[in-house]
């Protein structure tokens, strides 16, 4: 169902005598973690401990611990089922637990459709794009690969390697 402007960000499901609105969660859109606001990442499907297929998205591992809630507009929409933040990883797997929300295949602010079926290695000179709740939609040219960056977390150095310079 599209609204009068052609948008289809939400649809109505008729269940008996009541109506449920399902809102789209768009990659690059806002989400709130215990550490503060950040972006919704790629949509994913995964198996839980009972081999049930679950829906969710990837977000920033430095902002979540396992069991933390992900919220949007003050409402819990999911829970972190796994989180990694180390020299090679910065990812959290968020399981969508609120049936009023589902993932969209359209990137927030850019209306580009996602391609979930592949990934590619980029080389120097490639143009890459990113979208985030605080950074907006940006692009850049890869100037080098296999770089590293060091952060200080709790006064301890953390070096992340194999990063791109843009």
Regions from the PLM with identified roles:
Residues 1-23:
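Autoinhibitory propeptides
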Residues 24-161:
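Serine endopeptidase catalytic core focused on the charge-relay Asp
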Residues 162-166:
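Surface-exposed, low-hydrophobicity beta-strand/loop segments enriched in small/polar/acidic residues
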């Amino acid at each position: 169902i599209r609204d009068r402007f052609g948008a289809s960000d939400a649809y109505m499901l008729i269940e008996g005598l009541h109506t449920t609105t399902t809102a789209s969660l768009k990659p690059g859109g806002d989400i709130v973690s215990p550490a503060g606001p950040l972006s919704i990442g790629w949509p994913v499907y995964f198996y839980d401990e009972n081999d049930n297929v679950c829906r969710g998205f990837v977000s920033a591992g430095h902002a979540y611990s396992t069991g933390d809630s992900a919220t949007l507009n003050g409402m819990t929409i999911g829970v972190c089922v796994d989180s990694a933040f180390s020299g090679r990883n910065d990812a959290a797997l968020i399981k969508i637990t609120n049936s009023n929300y589902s993932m969209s295949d359209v990137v927030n602010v850019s209306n580009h459709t996602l391609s979930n079926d592949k990934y590619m290695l980029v080389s120097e000179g490639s143009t890459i794009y990113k979208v985030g709740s605080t950074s907006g939609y940006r692009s850049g040219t890869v100037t080098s690969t296999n770089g590293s960056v060091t952060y200080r977390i709790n006064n301890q150095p953390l070096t992340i390697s194999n990063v791109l310079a843009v």
